[in-house]
Amino acid sequence: MTDTVFSSSSSRWMCPSDRPLQSNDKEQLQTGWSVHPSGQPDRQRKQEELTDEEKEIINRVIARAEKMEEMEQERIGRLVDRLENMRKNVAGDGVNRCILCGEQLGMLGSACVVCEDCKKNVCTKCGVETSNNRPHPVWLCKICIEQREVWKRSGAWFFKGFPKQVLPQPMPIKKNKPQQPVSEPVPAAPEPATPEPKHPARAPTRGDTEDRRGPGQKTGPDMTSAPGRGSYGPPVRRASEARMSSSGRDSDSWDQGHGMAAGDPSQSPAGLRRANSVQASRPAPASMQSPAPPQPGQPGPPGGSRPSPGPTGRFPDQRPEVAPSDPDYTGAAAQPREERTGGIGGYSAAGTREDRAGHPPGSYTQASAAAPQPVVASARQPPPPEEDEEEANSYDSDEATTLGALEFSLLYDQDNSSLHCTIIKAKGLKPMDSNGLADPYVKLHLLPGASKSNKLRTKTLRNTRNPIWNETLVYHGITDEDMQRKTLRISVCDEDKFGHNEFIGETRFSLKKLKPNQRKNFNICLERVIPMKRAGTTGSARGMALYEEEQVERIGDIEERGKILVSLMYSTQQGGLIVGIIRCVHLAAMDANGYSDPFVKLWLKPDMGKKAKHKTQIKKKTLNPEFNEEFFYDIKHSDLAKKSLDISVWDYDIGKSNDYIGGCQLGISAKGERLKHWYECLKNKDKKIERWHQLQNENHVSSD
């Protein structure tokens, strides 16, 4: 009964009864779980060598991985160098004097606290109080704080060290390959090829080729199957794995500089368990899947060492642009993708991603598996046009159409300096809950500089995969300069009441493509991770793009303190200046919870006494406060030209001095938009003039 069910003709995979068969018999009869019942002899290409185009694609992937590895090592090196400089510049002994600044501690000196990690004495200025579950406060010195930051930003906190990795060896390419006319019949016998060497235990040298190695390195049963389709080693890992594992190249020197890792990860039990778990999660190398090489007169083992059904499943980049018999075919197929796609990155947010929505899931992996492939490379039919290999590897292409689609519209109101984002609906979202549904919501960020200050979100809709929001989220204070350099990231997430919210998918749109005062509608398939297109970088892989984006976001967070919308009007009826504080946007977070308690202070200089100073109300726990308050200064119009208005934004704190967020100064001595705003106010009486001003980290007012 069991045999009848499993060997049904309608089943795609056939498993006969294996009770009377031994393991060797299964290999000879081509039976087992991995044997396809039809078309097996034509699809099996173990004796065919990889083409030069395929080898070039593999070499480009390896070069990208090495590039990312070098960038990761440089990034960690900068972190370590900064930490070492802090350690070298200590001025105290950590007992009677502060370990950092060297200030005297004790009864006659500053207050003393003990660092929780290094157990050294520091003053309260050089120590940082951290929150913990313990009832008493926990203090850390700035060196230990920096050490924890390095441990966190390098990813070593997860692995308790750095895992090792060995990159695949570059594939040798034979340039003087003889050509055969397509019209002549070619025998189907496989051509003999020189076996490929097995990967060494150390990292391979970039320039090593098959010709430079001796014949003694080409022995072993696994080496005879090198001309097979999948014999070039384990599949290349995704860029997200490469970013984590590439940091382990200099793990020994990093551990010595930090004193936090427990030696070589491969020598400790935890390191062995970690290495086993990492290797178990990856596909096994093709050379290990075939224990014996196939003989010319004997069919290959049922396991098949080919990594994909056809050439387009693994390498969708090799789309022939000329005839295969043309002498320039190799160069045309391997030309840089800048010439084919129009730039690094290769696609726009509104263009190609919409085209991808038309492809069914797994279209380019199953289409080539349906038809048998000829054995001879020169007579092979060109594969159907597919996407670039680098573009397909930049994100999870197999889930490009399974995450769902999002419909939204964008409108830039240039007169009011606002960006209106209308989230209409989503369709076919990926189920995230156990009931096969989701609780989706949409959140928006502006890149670079993503933070809570520019985060907007919709309401959450329960138990649906096809939500309809019809919500409009508005970004205020968006100038023409912001439209040229900002990118809008739209993320769809699943809300979880009892845990962390789960990410479903996202899409990004460069705001410089949006025309002012013209609404643009979008219906785009969600992607798991979308790389940013950056000019001047070769091989914009996902890991490199995210790393560059992380660097830009950190720079943006440091430079931008926020913006303030101010209105000025000189009233001839009241005989004075009316200053309106309308709102602030994208303020810097000053509190530990990631928010601020902002208020605005005004000071008309030179000093006119107490009547020259005004202050708004305090807005609690927000980075985008709305004040809508007006203040009146009784001053003659002729005297106003000699004055300057100082505007400062502060974070209110209880029990200590307020934190300065940023400010700006309007007056004759100002420059740019500030001077223009003040001049228009003096020129146009009884007319309210509103302007956005960038806050600067220049404090002109005391915190009292």
UniProtKB/Swiss-Prot annotation:
Protein modification: Ubiquitinated. Deubiquitinated by CAND1 to prevent its degradation.
Biased composition (Acidic residues): 385-398
Residues reported in the UniProt entry to bind Ca(2+) 3: E549, D591, D597, D651, Y652, D653
GO cellular component, one term: neuron projection
Pfam family, any one: C2
Subunit organization: Interacts with RAB3B, RAB3C, RAB3D, RAB8A, RAB27A and RAB27B. Interacts with RAB3A; this interaction recruits RPH3A to synaptic vesicules. Interacts (via C2B domain) with SNAP25. Interacts with deubiquitinating enzyme CAND1; this interaction results in the deubiquitination of RPH3A. Interacts with GRIN2A and DLG4; this ternary complex regulates NMDA receptor composition at postsynaptic membranes. Interacts with SNCA.
Role noted for this protein: Plays an essential role in docking and fusion steps of regulated exocytosis. At the presynaptic level, RPH3A is recruited by RAB3A to the synaptic vesicle membrane in a GTP-dependent manner where it modulates synaptic vesicle trafficking and calcium-triggered neurotransmitter release. In the post-synaptic compartment, forms a ternary complex with GRIN2A and DLG4 and regulates NMDA receptor stability. Also plays a role in the exocytosis of arginine vasopressin hormone.
Domain description: Binds calcium via the C2 domains. The calcium-bound C2 domains mediate interactions with phospholipid bilayers.
Protein name: Rabphilin-3A
Organism: Bos taurus
